[in-house]
Amino acid sequence: MKGILGRKIGMTQIFATDGRLIPVTVVEVEHNIVLRVLTKEQNGYQALQLAVEDKRISLVSKPDQGQFKKANTTPKRFVKEIRNMDGYNSGDIIKADIFTAGEFVDVTGTSKGKGFTGSIKRHNYSRGPMGHGSGYHRGVGSMGAIAPNRILKSKKMPGHIGTEKVTIQNLEIIAIDTEKNALLVKGSIPGPKKQFVVIKEAIKGLKPNTPTELLKRTVETKTPDPTVKEEKPVEGVVDAAVDTTLTAVTDAPASKTE
């Protein structure tokens, strides 16, 4: 198992050499510090505790400051454990090149908050008849039998939706920019912009695609039309996509859910 911590920057799109448009999410992956190494003998399970992004020391408690000093690093903002990951020692640095283009990963983050909503949107209830005489349209409906004389704890009711831990599995890594410390992941990932996420090796173990298969995959073979001018793929589309997305989000306000 391998994994890394990052921050969601935003979404963009790139074009493959065969003209396919690929929607991608840019994840900024700064250098991760191995804070602690947990073993089965001492802790009961095997894991690495990773930390990323500096934090003011005045915002860190004394016990936490001691943990960072043991790893010879400054206080960090985002700390997470990744289980069944080994091969590193306390104080080691993990970079974006731990993954390769074509690999499949599982991304875990906190979903966007959507505020207070009704039972139809929150729990996918069916609404009542919308005619004027029905007297029931978008209500909760029956809340239980008469006998308990109360509403049971498990009853699905209106309330807050979002800001929950969500994992999306088997997302493909389209490209890696080691200079800008960025990963381009196919599709969307949970959370708003500037949200911290955990990227781990896909647990279901899909066979990774090689970069040549990824960029030169074609749906079907067609005979070229001599009347249509062939457009060559633009070089550096990955760098351009990363630069544009990073620039667009640099001055954006921080998310409330962070």
Curated annotation (Swiss-Prot):
A Pfam family it matches: Ribosomal_L3
InterPro entries: Ribosomal_uL3, Ribosomal_uL3_bac/org-type, Ribosomal_uL3_CS, Transl_B-barrel_sf
GO molecular function, one term: structural constituent of ribosome
Any one of the GO BP annotations: translation
Keywords per UniProt: Ribonucleoprotein, Ribosomal protein, RNA-binding, rRNA-binding
Key word Phosphoprotein present: no
Signal peptide: none
HAMAP family tied to this protein: Ribosomal_uL3_B
Role summary: One of the primary rRNA binding proteins, it binds directly near the 3'-end of the 23S rRNA, where it nucleates assembly of the 50S subunit.
Family indicated by similarity: Belongs to the universal ribosomal protein uL3 family.
Protein name: Large ribosomal subunit protein uL3
Organism expressing this protein natively: Spiroplasma kunkelii
